[in-house]
Amino acid sequence: MHATELNTGHGSQRAIRLAPSILSADFARLGEEVCAIEAGGADLVHFDVMDNHYVPNLTIGPLVCEAIRPLVSIPIDVHLMVEPVDALIPLFAKAGANIISFHPEASRHVDRTIGLIRDHGCKAGLVLNPATPLGWLDHTLDQLDLVLLMSVNPGFGGQAFIPGVLDKVRQARARIDRQVDAGGRPVWLEIDGGVKADNIAAIARAGADTFVAGSAVFGAPDADGGYSSILYRLREAATVT
């Protein structure tokens, strides 16, 4: 892992994690692309799964996850934008996912879905769209490993960051910090959508520690085809004091 530490002012250091989204990668060279982001310093591979039902787009499934799993040692962070969600969880766990996140609207029983992810040996995340209230965390935060806040409406890459989500990030960070201060489990706070070098510092200051970036990474390769430079710039910008 390449995560760097961020001084939060909350009495502890908070790691910064970068999770390039392969939705923006060159799919004709996907194996090379995931190897390049790991070599460039990525902490996670973000894997967007869309079903043309929960969101109006269709992407990739467990076979692709299984194909890239032997190529990288960093965790695969699977974001399920599918409905219903439960049937796919065992398939992605078997394919090598380390983290599986889902949208509460896509589950009939959110608590059961979280348990299903954990039962299959993966870390569990809950994804909240820009208009989905943080109230979903009231009875789930103590079971989660990750909260993923969408800063665009899910379905397509390359969208612009919604600035109003920053206040939601601050509120989610406060909830997580209260849980940790009370002796509860730490939870990663991930942001996905429109993350770029010119806004990642503001997002980090609001409290995010894990950053999904698609076109910002894969649209800025080095001359040798790698991604070390852009990942370094993103990490430096996110490491605010």
Curated annotation (Swiss-Prot):
<keyword id="KW-0479">Metal-binding</keyword>
<comment type="similarity">
    <text>Belongs to the ribulose-phosphate 3-epimerase family.</text>
</comment>
<dbReference type="GO" id="GO:0004750">
    <property type="term" value="F:D-ribulose-phosphate 3-epimerase activity"/>
</dbReference>
<feature type="binding site">
    <location>
        <position position="21"/>
    </location>
    <ligand>
        <name>substrate</name>
    </ligand>
</feature>
<dbReference type="InterPro" id="IPR026019">
    <property type="entry name" value="Ribul_P_3_epim"/>
</dbReference>
<comment type="function">
    <text>Catalyzes the reversible epimerization of D-ribulose 5-phosphate to D-xylulose 5-phosphate.</text>
</comment>
<keyword id="KW-0119">Carbohydrate metabolism</keyword>
<dbReference type="InterPro" id="IPR013785">
    <property type="entry name" value="Aldolase_TIM"/>
</dbReference>
<feature type="binding site">
    <location>
        <begin position="192"/>
        <end position="194"/>
    </location>
    <ligand>
        <name>substrate</name>
    </ligand>
</feature>
<dbReference type="GO" id="GO:0019253">
    <property type="term" value="P:reductive pentose-phosphate cycle"/>
</dbReference>
<dbReference type="GO" id="GO:0046872">
    <property type="term" value="F:metal ion binding"/>
</dbReference>
<keyword id="KW-0413">Isomerase</keyword>
<dbReference type="GO" id="GO:0019323">
    <property type="term" value="P:pentose catabolic process"/>
</dbReference>
<feature type="binding site">
    <location>
        <position position="48"/>
    </location>
    <ligand>
        <name>a divalent metal cation</name>
    </ligand>
</feature>
<comment type="pathway">
    <text>Carbohydrate degradation.</text>
</comment>
<feature type="binding site">
    <location>
        <position position="46"/>
    </location>
    <ligand>
        <name>a divalent metal cation</name>
    </ligand>
</feature>
<dbReference type="Pfam" id="PF00834">
    <property type="entry name" value="Ribul_P_3_epim"/>
</dbReference>
<feature type="active site" description="Proton acceptor">
    <location>
        <position position="48"/>
    </location>
</feature>
<dbReference type="InterPro" id="IPR011060">
    <property type="entry name" value="RibuloseP-bd_barrel"/>
</dbReference>
<feature type="binding site">
    <location>
        <begin position="155"/>
        <end position="158"/>
    </location>
    <ligand>
        <name>substrate</name>
    </ligand>
</feature>
<dbReference type="InterPro" id="IPR000056">
    <property type="entry name" value="Ribul_P_3_epim-like"/>
</dbReference>
<protein>
    <recommendedName>
        <fullName>Ribulose-phosphate 3-epimerase 1</fullName>
        <ecNumber>5.1.3.1</ecNumber>
    </recommendedName>
</protein>
<keyword id="KW-0113">Calvin cycle</keyword>
<dbReference type="GO" id="GO:0006098">
    <property type="term" value="P:pentose-phosphate shunt"/>
</dbReference>
<feature type="binding site">
    <location>
        <begin position="214"/>
        <end position="215"/>
    </location>
    <ligand>
        <name>substrate</name>
    </ligand>
</feature>
<feature type="binding site">
    <location>
        <position position="79"/>
    </location>
    <ligand>
        <name>a divalent metal cation</name>
    </ligand>
</feature>
<feature type="binding site">
    <location>
        <position position="192"/>
    </location>
    <ligand>
        <name>a divalent metal cation</name>
    </ligand>
</feature>
<feature type="active site" description="Proton donor">
    <location>
        <position position="192"/>
    </location>
</feature>
<feature type="binding site">
    <location>
        <position position="79"/>
    </location>
    <ligand>
        <name>substrate</name>
    </ligand>
</feature>
